[in-house]
């Protein structure tokens, strides 16, 4: 009896020792996600969250070893509501809790003020915020993983002038840092190309009724209307353009490439909406096809606009940790500045300000409710 007790005790002690050893050889790396997990842009926030989640699952399956320890990646998600005040609070929460890698924010108006907090706390930020100001603040460990407004806006102006062959354009923006910045770049390039901006109207990122500003715009007879804003506004805007008999095309940035556009706008978006998708043509690409299939199997739906980019950047970070032999954001960031990464959505290489070098743009429209690529820049 005494022998059995001693034997059981020794076995239990050995098991605890093994467990303790396993824990000692494991290092937790938290990846934060700041995005709109409530409100009209929830669909985008959830998609981005899924991209991060899938990458974390893939990285954990690889059992990356750094400094003799197996890295265990964990996702920590917070709802910034696409609101600057909420986003700054999320940033402070992440910094205070020791999160040193953050994916997001999604909205430029959140990214601009939150980046200061992240930089002060030594946290790496990887954002899809496209306003040029984001990478002009001098933060050393901030990465913009898609093209900026400068490229998206100017490319859409070039498409309007050279492909659609229009002469008169109207501009509407939602007064957000993203929408206004993108519209400014479009208008500036349009004028350089000899197009006439016949009118500029303003709305908000909460509006759904655009009849008044569209009526004003209709009187000026633009051939295209450029909208700087998000899909939850662009879709009803397309519907109301149709109701008013406005025959102009509706142009915009990558947010208008979302599958939410045909869901919310119906057939009003078909061959009317043209958007600047911040990715590459992936038709026929085996890697992109495999990713889409894996994403759909895991989450029951196809990825939206940015989910694949979030996935790529988290995988990029994981590889950089492995290759640099460190989980220190400064060392990992330095490696990412020096070495390009080939992901699902192309190559990720960054300049000294954190802008993605040669970030691709694909102009797309919708046919039968599905996105159709037209041209790449």
Regions found by a protein language model. Give the residues of each.
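N-terminal signal peptide c-region/cleavage motif recognized by signal peptidases
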Residues: 19-21
């Amino acid at each position: 009896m005494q022998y059995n007790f001693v034997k059981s005790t020794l076995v239990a002690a050995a098991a605890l020792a093994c467990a303790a050893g396993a824990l000692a050889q494991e290092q937790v790396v938290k990846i934060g996600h700041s995005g709109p997990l409530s409100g009209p842009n929830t669909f985008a926030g959830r998609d981005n969250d899924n991209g991060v989640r899938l990458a974390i699952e893939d990285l954990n399956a690889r059992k990356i070893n750094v400094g003799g320890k197996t890295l265990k990646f964990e996702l920590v998600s917070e709802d910034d509501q696409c609101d600057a005040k909420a986003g700054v609070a999320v940033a402070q929460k992440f910094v205070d809790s020791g999160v040193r890698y953050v994916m997001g924010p999604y909205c430029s108006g959140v990214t601009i003020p939150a980046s200061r907090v992240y930089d002060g706390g030594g946290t790496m930020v990887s954002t899809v915020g496209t306003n040029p100001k984001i990478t002009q603040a001098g933060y050393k460990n901030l990465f913009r993983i898609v093209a900026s407004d400068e490229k998206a806006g100017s490319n859409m102006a070039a498409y309007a002038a050279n492909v659609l062959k229009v002469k008169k354009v109207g501009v509407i923006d939602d007064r957000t840092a993203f929408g206004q910045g993108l519209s400014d770049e479009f208008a500036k390039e349009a004028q350089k190309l000899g197009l006439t901006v016949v009118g500029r109207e303003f709305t908000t990122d909460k509006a759904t009724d655009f009849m008044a500003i569209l009526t004003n715009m209709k009187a000026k007879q633009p051939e295209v209307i450029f909208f700087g804003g998000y899909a939850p506004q662009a879709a009803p805007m397309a519907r109301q353009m149709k109701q008013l008999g406005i025959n102009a095309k509706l142009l915009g940035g990558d947010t208008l490439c979302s599958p939410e556009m045909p869901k919310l706008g119906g057939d009003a978006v078909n061959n009317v909406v043209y958007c600047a998708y911040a990715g590459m043509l992936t038709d026929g690409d085996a890697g992109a096809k495999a990713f889409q299939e894996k994403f759909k199997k895991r989450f029951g739906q196809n990825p939206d606009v940015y989910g694949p980019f979030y996935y790529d950047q988290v995988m990029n970070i994981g590889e950089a940790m492995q290759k640099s032999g460190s989980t220190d954001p400064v060392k990992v960031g330095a490696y990412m500045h020096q070495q390009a990464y080939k992901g699902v959505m192309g190559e990720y290489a960054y300049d000294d300000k954190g802008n993605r070098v040669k970030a691709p743009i694909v102009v797309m429209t919708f046919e039968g409710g599905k996105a159709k690529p037209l041209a790449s820049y």
